[in-house]
Each structure stands twice: as C-alpha cells, then as structure tokens.
Amino acid sequence: MIIALADLGDADVQALIAFHQQAMQAGSPPGLSFALDLSGLADPVVSVWAVRVDDRVAAIGALKLLGGGQAELKSMRTHPDFLRRGIAAQLLEAIIDHARSQAITRLSLETGGGPAFDPALALYRKRGFVNGAAFGDYVLTDFNQCLHLTLV
C-alpha cells in the first residue's frame, strides 16, 4: 500500500472522486451534500491523497486548510473493492500527521447520518473525533453533523 499526494489528472483518481460525489448526492437530502468535485479539490488550499494497492486507487482523502490553525477533512472514500481492510484508517492517520506538520490544532469534518454513514462515523469516532458545533458555512440539521478532533 502506498499513500501519496494524488495526481488529480489521473483517470482512476478522477473516477473515485466522481463515485464519491455521486454517492454523497444520492445518499443525502437535496442541498445537504457538500462533497467537493474535481474543481473543488483542485483548490490550492486543498491537498488530496490517494492510496494505491497493487497499482489500483483504493481510497482518496483530502484536507482543506481553513486558516487560524483549523482544517477540514474532505472526500474520504474507499473504493468498494477495498472495503474493510483498514485502508481508510491508515489514510486518516496520514492526513492527521500532515495536519500536525502544518500546525493545525483542530481538524473538523461535516458528514451525514444514517446507515450509509455509520462506517465512516465509527472510523472517525474511534480515532477520537467528537460531535460538536457547526463550523465554516455549515448548518447542523437532522441529517448533517460536524465532528472535531483537537490536535496537539
């Protein structure tokens, strides 16, 4: 397994990004999916990683710098062929390590609720993320929730 900054021009990376965005839109009430598309992930304040296993893109994840020592975890997605292998947990650790190296003191994320989101929520909570207040432009709803991890 290799975790490295992603080449957003790579067709396999683009396909997993598109799959993630489609799944988030399909599994969220109208107007409550905030998954970034390829152009959003290309923003200079966003870093995107890809995990490769046997030369296949197994997962992606991104970190968006928010300023003031804060950053947002974005676009975490494991390809269906690679689920339940611990890949997402290793990718999450790599992103957290990078955040620390950038002097980030709080890492936040916004996600949905319900069965489709339970595996991701379990991963984040196991790593120490806790539910909290909305951040940025997000608004908490019956569907959306925000989680935070203090980095020291």
Where are these regions (language model features)?
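Generic recognition of short, well-ordered alpha-helical segments
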Residues: 15, 90, 119-122
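Flexible, active-site-proximal loop/turn residues at the rims of small-molecule/cofactor binding pockets
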Residues: 67, 82, 113
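Active-site acidic-Proline motif in GNAT/NAT acetyltransferases
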Residues: 79-81, 85
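Residues forming the Rossmann-fold NAD(P)(H) cofactor-binding site
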Residues: 85, 89, 93
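Acetyl-CoA-dependent GNAT
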Residues: 1-70, 74, 79, 92-93, ...
